Amino acid sequence: MSVPQRLVIATRASRLALWQAEHVRDRLRALYPACAVELLTLTTRGDQILDRTLSKVGGKGLFVKELETALLDGRADLAVHSLKDVPVDLQAPFELCAILERADPRDAFVSNQYTTLADLPAGAVVGTSSLRRESQIRQRYPHLSVKPLRGNLDTRLSKLDRGDYAAIVLAAAGLQRLGMGERIRSLLEPEDSLPAAGQGALGIEIRNDRNDLREWLAPLACSRTTACVVAERAVSRALGGSCQVPLAAYAELNGNSLALRALVASPDGTRVIRSQHAGPAEQAQAIGQAAAQELLSNGADAILAELQDPPAS
């Protein structure tokens, strides 16, 4: 295998996105010491729209389009993403080439006054950026007030610190990667807040005509994480998964046995449809599809129809 002379990684400009890209850069430099690995920092539309939730302005694709443009015009060779922000169906000519080992997939409870969601008094304001978290919080704690929370990690924490929220819920991996794990008051187990498909994992996107990159990037891929994420994203794909759908999917591997949990909820949390499926890891795609079909059969289809065509108020 010939060693690349130079590789350029496209990344978003946020501190967390830069950490993720630098992590991949450092892994590549260790693998290929003679290769010059550089970062191309870009601002995406998702980074610019901070006054509305993603579910109202176009969803996950807002975080990848500018990076894909850089892949297309040759300014970058690969793009690094937080996998939960990547649409399940990438448009041609793009593909996910490698999925790295997953970090902590759980959601984190962050507050300056309280230790858990259960400690919050009635009417306390909880901030979160996703309908998935919002619906699960509303189901378990209907006495709380859940409000949208946008911005990068530092912005979200500053909004908490100035008193806009009593608590916020966000992905644990982001805090831990940036050395801010001490801000976490408690971790929400999957039983309490089922994670998003791909949460905690990083994905590398390339153009599908870059066969050379597939070979060079293969050592970064984690087969166990990939199996779990394939099952999770199969659920999301079958249900038209986007930021507009309160959808969660989380798989775990025990040996070669893959166990998948998934749910679809109404945004107000009054209806939560759950599914569990298991099987050999090599059947990850089929396991995800089976879980999605069970969700649809048990009432998720009605929730999805309402989200696509909300009733007139």
UniProtKB/Swiss-Prot annotation:
Its cofactor is dipyrromethane. Binds 1 dipyrromethane group covalently. One of its GO terms (cellular component) is cytoplasm. The keyword Transferase applies. GO terms for molecular function: hydroxymethylbilane synthase activity. It is an enzyme of class 2 (transferase). One of its GO terms (biological process) is protoporphyrinogen IX biosynthetic process. It catalyses: 4 porphobilinogen + H2O = hydroxymethylbilane + 4 NH4(+). Keywords: Porphyrin biosynthesis, Transferase. The modification S-(dipyrrolylmethanemethyl)cysteine is found at C243. InterPro entries: HemC, Porphobilin_deaminase_cofac_BS, Porphobilin_deaminase_N, Porphobilinogen_deaminase_C, Porphobilinogen_deaminase_C_sf. The porphobilinogen subunits are added to the dipyrromethane group. Belongs to the HMBS family. Tetrapolymerization of the monopyrrole PBG into the hydroxymethylbilane pre-uroporphyrinogen in several discrete steps. This is Porphobilinogen deaminase. It comes from Bordetella petrii (strain ATCC BAA-461 / DSM 12804 / CCUG 43448).
